[in-house]
UniProtKB/Swiss-Prot annotation:
Protein's name according to its UniProt entry: Insulin-like growth factor 2 mRNA-binding protein 3
Highest taxon, organism lineage: Eukaryota
Native species: Danio rerio (Zebrafish)
GO biological process entries: CRD-mediated mRNA stabilization; germ cell development; germ cell migration; mRNA transport; nervous system development; regulation of embryonic development; regulation of translation; sex determination
One protein family per Pfam: KH_1
Lineage: Eukaryota, Metazoa, Chordata, Craniata, Vertebrata
Oligomeric form and interacting partners: Homodimer and multimer.
Length: 582
């Protein structure tokens, strides 16, 4: 992208005029200017120089009474789904931009571009041409925090092939190597950069980290190729403030070390004698795996880095604050090494969770997995809030049919008897929160006996409530280390089906149930010779990990719905009978 288009060129302008402007601003060019009526083209040595020309000249330099407009030269056939957005406010929250971009369609990827300017630049790919065109029309000149956005097309190499990829989850790449897609595209990209580093720093050090007129934080940002958000306005009066670092793992670690060095220097200058520990915020979903079975993972990190690590208690969590504080004490070098190891484990956990989520997401039509709160949200700098605003484009029909099926279902989920306390929580607090969050009725059935190894959780609610409630229970068992760090949580779930539909679930010669097991990876058993209960229902047993179990439950409910529809009497052509008056 080193070829430039220069617009709004005066009829009096010549190639020499344009050459002198580029020379005046010390912008090299690698070929003569091609001047046409009202516009011109020129080649730059590389993309970085082209970006500098756009930032320096576009809308700022006048020639013969006309202000030049400079942007990437894009052939018509390549003006498809890719846009470049420039002049983004430097300290803007990425979630805000994410939400803005999402208003115009599916954002398949968004890569931040390295520039020498204070403002940020991103390359965005939309899922369709019309979405990109609408975003271009609406966002060009759009004011954000007194900065007017500048939007232009950039070459879309795939446009000629006419094969745009299917839309996926939005995510912003940090400064550094482009992420090359998003988790829901066909090829599995590297996901480490999706997990920002979240730090908690004493409020008295925030000023030193920012520096005079933001010079220090700008310097860190430039050196480490990162995007750093200091959340000064959060929790007014709090003793500590969160900092979010978006970058590659190496960039995050480098920024973390710089911030620790500044805090240590400030502590010495202000004669603070107590130790300043490193505090990392991590979503609770990942902490169980960070700790490991019997604390083995955490102990190993402590031994390898010569640090002392503590983690805030579960009681501090709420539905609105799902993060735990990991406190690391040791020398600066030791803390920096511990941060690398801790975040490596967190990123691995995130990558595994997202892989599992997207593996099954396309198999459950219309279910917006990101909206269900099973994975880190914007609070922890993870998946952004615009993702949860509704179903993905293209899944509208599925979403509506899913939403229309609001009939309540009852599922019996069997958990280890020892886990009952963790699910209920202190004075029943956790199970109440879970019930409110999921919109489901959740009850723990009495134990079958003193030596019972399992307890039954009775969950009643519509499909989405089932998904939320069961997902949180699976997650809780993992967090509380009832399963090993590399062990999948597999639970048995029982659902009741009408006896007249049991044969359809099994299929001829067991064909349907076998296909169901192959599709979902869950074990599905319809016990033979069951006596139907008083409601003429029999039990179907499903055993598997969360997504396998969910998919099997949904498929079985689909079969039941089909059977019920087929059994409904067809309406008479003559219409309903008219009631006679007595």
């Amino acid at each position: 992208m080193n070829k430039l288009y220069i617009g709004n060129v005066s009829e009096q302008a010549s190639a020499l005029d344009l050459e002198s402007i580029f020379e005046q601003w010390k912008i090299p060019f690698s070929a003569p200017f091609l001047v046409k009526s009202g516009y011109a083209f020129v080649d730059c040595p590389d993309e970085k120089v082209a970006m500098r020309a756009i930032d320096t000249l576009s809308g700022k330099v006048e020639l013969h009474g006309k202000v030049l407009e400079v942007e990437h030269s894009v052939p018509k056939r390549q003006r498809s789904c890719k846009l470049q957005i420039r002049n983004i406010p430097p300290h803007m929250q990425w979630e805000v931009l994410d939400g803005l971009l999402a208003q115009y369609g599916t954002v398949e990827s968004c890569e931040q571009v390295n520039t020498d300017t204070e403002t940020a630049v991103v390359n965005v790919r939309y899922g369709a041409k019309d979405q990109a065109r609408e975003a271009m029309d609406k966002l060009n000149g759009f004011l954000m925090e007194n900065y007017a956005l500048k939007v232009s097309y950039i070459p879309d190499e795939t446009a000629a092939a006419d094969a745009p990829a299917v839309g996926g989850r939005r995510g912003f790449n940090p400064r550094g190597p482009p992420r090359q897609g998003s988790p829901s595209l066909g090829a599995r990209p590297k996901l480490q950069s999706d997990v920002p580093l979240r730090l908690l720093v004493p409020t008295q050090f925030v000023g030193a980290i920012i520096g005079k007129e933001g010079a220090t934080i700008r310097n860190i940002t430039k050196q480490t190729h990162s995007k750093i958000d200091i959340h000064r306005k959060e929790n007014a009066g709090a003793a500590e403030k969160p900092i979010t670092v978006h970058s590659t793992p190496e960039g995050c670690s480098s920024a973390c070390r710089n911030i620790m060095e500044i805090m240590q220097k400030e502590a010495i200058d202000t004669k603070i004698t107590e130790e300043i520990p490193l505090k990392i915020l991590a979503h609770n979903n990942f902490v169980g795996r960070l700790i490991g079975k019997e604390g083995r993972n955490l102990k190993k990190i402590e031994q390898d880095t010569d640090t002392k690590i503590t983690i805030s208690p579960l009681q501090d969590l709420t539905l609105y604050n799902p993060e735990r504080t990991i406190t690391v004490k040791g020398t600066l070098d030791a803390c920096a090494k511990a941060e690398e190891e801790i975040m490596k484990k967190v990123r691995e956990s995130y990558e595994n969770d997202v892989a599992a989520m997207h593996l099954q997401s396309n198999l459950i039509p219309g279910l917006n997995l990101n909206a269900l709160g099973l994975f880190p949200g914007a609070a922890s700098g993870g998946i952004s809030p615009s993702v949860v605003s509704g179903p993905p484009p293209g899944a509208q029909a599925g979403y509506q049919s899913f939403g229309a099926q609001m009939e309540s279902e009852t599922v019996h989920l069997f958990i280890p008897a020892l886990a009952v306390g963790a699910i209920i929580g202190k004075q029943g607090q956790h199970i109440k929160q879970l019930s409110r969050f999921a919109g489901a009725s959740i009850k723990i059935a009495p134990a079958d006996g003193i030596d019972a190894k399992q307890r039954m959780v009775i969950i009643s609610g519509p499909p989405e409530a089932q998904f939320k409630a069961q997902g949180r229970i699976f997650g809780k068992l993992k967090e509380e280390n009832f399963f090993g760090p590399k062990e999948e949580v597999k639970l048995e779930a029982h659902i009741k089906v009408p006896s007249f539909a049991a044969g359809r679930v099994i299929g001829k010669g067991g064909k349907t149930v076998n296909e169901l097991q192959n599709l979902t990876s869950a074990e599905v058993v319809v016990p033979r010779d069951q006596t139907p209960d008083e409601n003429d229902q029999v039990v179907v047993k499903i055993t598997g990990h969360f997504y396998a179990s969910q998919l099997a439950q949904r498929k079985i409910q689909e079969i039941i719905s089909q059977v019920r529809r087929q059994q409904q009497p067809k309406p008479s052509a003559a219409g309903p009978p008219v009631a006679r008056r007595k």
